[in-house]
From Swiss-Prot:
Residue spans crossing the bilayer: none
The keyword Nucleotide-binding belongs to this UniProt entry's keyword annotation: yes
Organism from which the protein derives: Citrobacter koseri (strain ATCC BAA-895 / CDC 4225-83 / SGSC4696)
UniProt entry tagged with the keyword Phosphoprotein: yes
UniProt-listed InterPro entries: ATPase_NBD, Chaperone_DnaK, Heat_shock_70_CS, HSP70_C_sf, HSP70_peptide-bd_sf, Hsp_70_fam
SUPFAM superfamilies membership: Actin-like ATPase domain, Heat shock protein 70kD (HSP70), C-terminal subdomain, Heat shock protein 70kD (HSP70), peptide-binding domain
Induction notes from the record: By stress conditions e.g. heat shock.
Region named Disordered: 602-638
Lineage: superkingdom: Bacteria
Low complexity biased stretches: 602-620
Keywords: ATP-binding, Chaperone, Nucleotide-binding, Phosphoprotein, Stress response
Name recorded for this polypeptide: Chaperone protein DnaK
């Protein structure tokens, strides 16, 4: 069985790890970094860039450089959180035909899973380069508070990237695996506070050790899938924009290029303020007006940043209380607090968490890598490489159906350990009703319309009977990925309907297959592009070396040959500016043929140099005709 890799598909950064024997290893990407920015850029010449190369060109291509796509995955365009992003993101978010949030990239409609798949492909390639073999299976992490649609969309992204997603696991649970696996901790209850680039989770997890087997049981989870470092960045950007407007009277929001530079500077300043008390945001030539160029130079203190984001940090505290309450525990029952996600490096976040739990969070867990390591461990559990580990996760939100009066009736309560199955018998609301609609919901509200609609289906063929008489058994079955399968059966007629919830939105099978084919076609074009670059490099090398040899040959090279070579050099130079690999190779061949006389001269010169070297050695040898003498040591007489 091949390796199952572990991928932390993050909002801001992503990370990939594998099991190396019994140890998890985080892999470095092609740029030599252990994490990869979750940024995808579509350039004017049709190239797709991922990670650091995409980030570097963002300033000149803001509309087609996509980041924080995880905030859109599995979401509806009309969602309040999506509408908030529509107004602040430099790229274009649009409503798809099915009501989902999609993106408009250079006039082409693209689904978030399709874009996230580009990041997953880079993670896959990183693992393949390290292992030296193809990788087809992965464990991918998601925020614990992701709903069914968001989990399904993440699995779709994996498929588009050419990966069979063996398991979707929750990020805090993965971090707990990374923390607890190599520690002789005995029985402990830990809180994992995960504040990443775009999402926030809190999970209360119990680690039990019985006869050498460790059980990781999630007791409760809570969170906010639209709270993270990107929101902190936005506060800083807004502050800088307002300060500049006060100072210069210019609103930078109308200038996408300036806003992209400002985004980078704001993120950098935020990071610097985790270790420094003050920083300068210095952006020369940020914009210009009739009076000339304008420069930004604004001092920002740590206290100022804290005042800007205090409410965001406080927003993360309420879910902590709910999670503890759901787990039936108090703060004193928590043995360890683990911080995950880059935003937890902010001193104010650490201080608030320490105040809430009454203890300092542990510092021995890498907030950027723990989740990917945990995913790799879960991959090892699935392949059998990691033994004596049992993971018991939970469903983050209640699941149920809409019943008479527009009420949500829960069949599976939140924080139920998964996989799980639950059935309940319902009946008809009208006399002689021959069909019922099963409307599947996810959420905690009593009114059905206030919850997330996951989908609906009809059960037909119910025998006519007075209302309340037919017995319709509805069964909810959640698999280990937290994905829901629903069936409804009329106990009288035996008629049954089943669906796997694909959400009322999401990608259908045809769309996924098309995206998989597109990804494969892109892989082919990527390979061709790589081959073109290699051929170009060979052509450049040939140009340089031939010119050098022409120079060295001097008058020894006949004029006719020199003219032919110059002509072939010029033709190759022109071909190198184009995109045709075959044309470059043909011109290289022509240059090689035109340079035959030059090669002969070069070989003669080389032979003469060799001969000259040999003569010099021989002369030296003659001079070295020295007689070895024997010496006798004469000791001084004392």
């Amino acid at each position: 069985m091949g390796k199952i890799i572990g991928i932390d598909l993050g909002t801001t950064n992503s990370c990939v790890a594998i099991m190396d024997g019994t140890t998890a290893r985080v892999l470095e990407n092609a740029e030599g970094d252990r994490t990869t920015p979750s940024i995808i850029a579509y350039t004017q010449d049709g190239e797709t860039l991922v990670g650091q190369p995409a980030k570097r060109q963002a300033v000149t291509n803001p509309q087609n450089t996509l980041f924080a796509i995880k905030r859109l995955i599995g979401r509806r365009f009309q969602d309040e959180e999506v509408q908030r992003d529509v107004s602040i993101m430099p790229y274009k978010i649009i409503g798809a035909d099915n009501g989902d949030a999609w993106l408009d990239v250079k006039g082409q409609k693209m689904a978030p899973p399709q874009i996230s798949a580009e990041v997953l492909k880079k993670m896959k390639k990183t693992a393949e380069d390290y292992l030296g073999e193809p990788v087809t299976e992965a464990v991918i992490t998601v925020p614990a508070y992701f709903n069914d649609a968001q989990r399904q969309a993440t699995k779709d992204a994996g498929r588009i990237a050419g990966l069979e997603v063996k398991r979707i696991i929750n990020e805090p649970t993965a971090a707990a695996l990374a923390y607890g696996l190599d520690k002789e901790v005995g029985n402990r209850t830990i809180a994992v506070y995960d504040l990443g680039g775009g999402t926030f989770d809190i999970s209360i997890i119990e680690i039990d050790e019985v006869d050498g087997e460790k059980t990781f049981e999630v007791l409760a989870t809570n969170g906010d899938t639209h709270l993270g470092g990107e929101d902190f960045d936005s506060r800083m950007i807004n502050y800088l924009v307002e300060e500049f407007k006060k100072d210069q009277g210019i609103d930078l929001r109308n200038d996408p290029l300036a806003m992209q530079r400002l985004k980078e500077a704001a993120e950098k300043a935020k990071i610097e303020l985790s270790s420094a008390q003050q920083t300068d945001v210095n952006l020369p030539y940020i914009t210009a007006d009739a009076t000339g160029p304008k420069h930004m130079n604004i001092k920002v203190t740590r206290a100022k940043l804290e005042s800007l984001v205090e409410d965001l940090v406080n927003r993360s505290i309420e879910p902590l209380k709910v999670a503890l309450q759901d787990a039936g525990l108090s703060v004193s029952d928590i043995n360890d607090v683990i911080l995950v996600g880059g935003q937890t490096r902010m001193p104010m976040v650490q201080k608030k968490v320490a105040e809430f739990f009454g203890k300092e969070p542990r510092k021995d867990v890498n907030p950027d890598e723990a989740v990917a390591i945990g995913a790799a461990v879960q991959g090892g559990v699935l392949t059998g490489d990691v033994k004596d580990v049992l993971l018991l996760d939970v469903t983050p939100l209640s699941l149920g159906i809409e019943t008479m009066g527009g009420v949500m009736t829960a069949l599976i309560s939140k924080n139920t350990t998964i996989p799980t199955k639950h059935s309940q018998v319902f009946s008809t609301a009208e006399d002689n009703q021959s069909a019922v609609t099963i409307h599947v919901l996810q959420g905690e509200r009593k009114r059905a319309s206030d919850n997330k609609s996951l989908g609906q289906f009809n059960l037909d063929g119910i025998n006519p009977a007075p209302r309340g008489m037919p017995q319709i058994e509805v069964t909810f079955d959640i698999d280990a990925d937290g994905i829901l399968h629903v069936s409804a059966k009329d106990k009288n007629s035996g008629k049954e309907q089943k669906i796997t919830i694909k959400a009322s939105s999401g990608l259908n099978e045809d769309e996924i297959q098309k995206m998989v084919r597109d990804a494969e076609a892109n892989a082919e074009s990527d390979r061709k592009f790589e081959e073109l670059v290699q051929t170009r490099n060979q052509g450049d090398h040939l140009l340089h070396s031939t010119r050098k040899q022409v120079e060295e040959a001097g008058d020894q090279l006949p004029a006719d040959d020199k003219t032919a070579i110059e002509s072939a050099l010029s033709a190759l130079e022109t071909a190198l500016k184009g995109e045709d690999k075959a044309a470059i190779e043909a011109k290289m061949q022509e240059l090689a043929q035109a340079s035959q006389k030059l090669m002969e001269i070069a070989q003669q010169q080389h032979a003469q140099q060799q001969a000259g070297g040999a003569d010099a050695s021989a002369n030296n040898a003659k001079d070295d005709d020295v007689v070895d003498a024997e010496f006798e040591e004469v000791k001084d007489k004392k």
